[in-house]
Amino acid sequence: MKSINDRYYMPVINKSFTGRWFESDMEFNTLYPLSIQALARCHWTSLPIAVKAAHFLAGDSDAKILDIGSGVGKFCLAAAYHTPKAWYYGVEQRKSLIYHAEVAKCNLGLNNVSFIHGNFTQLDFKKFDHFYFYNAFYENLDGTDKIDDSIDYSGELYNYYNRYLFKQLQQKPTGTRLCTLCSLESEVPADFHAIHSDFDGFLKFWVKV
């Protein structure tokens, strides 16, 4: 549950120096209250990974990229800053995390990023060109670190979400790009080929052929 301090946390931002927030993870994470910063190591994409994924996904001008399970928006915000000709959309079930993402977006003054409060199964995947996935379903499994207790968890949901994403990716056209981080790859159809990996294989770059 958010504290009063979390709810009204507003870092002092000088938008003339927006770039400094992207110089390090430590600097960027101070955009958020301490309770959110504490989750960064396990749950939020690091800046070096976000930058590499963004440059791969934003190969097309005006590409629309969906982050499935966007949390507090760190990937979307970093990607939007580094690839300003692409459009980033983050979908997240937890309203509290959407709040923190929106505050950070406003403070950074980024216009090519939007956040959607809801379940990714409610979205029309035809509206998006490429996808980023940081194993958002994994916390449904027993014994895993969970962000909070505000949503339901179960092995059944883990399997359902993986099957659903698999089917949506199956329907995407040739050339669709996908970046996965720390994924077990059960959501990746066979016609997506891994063309590169980085960060000891945890980050993978896929293209549908």
Regions found by a protein language model. Give the residues of each.
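Conserved SAM-binding motif I beta-strand of class I
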Residues: 87-92
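Short SAM/SAH-binding signature in class I
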Residues: 128-142
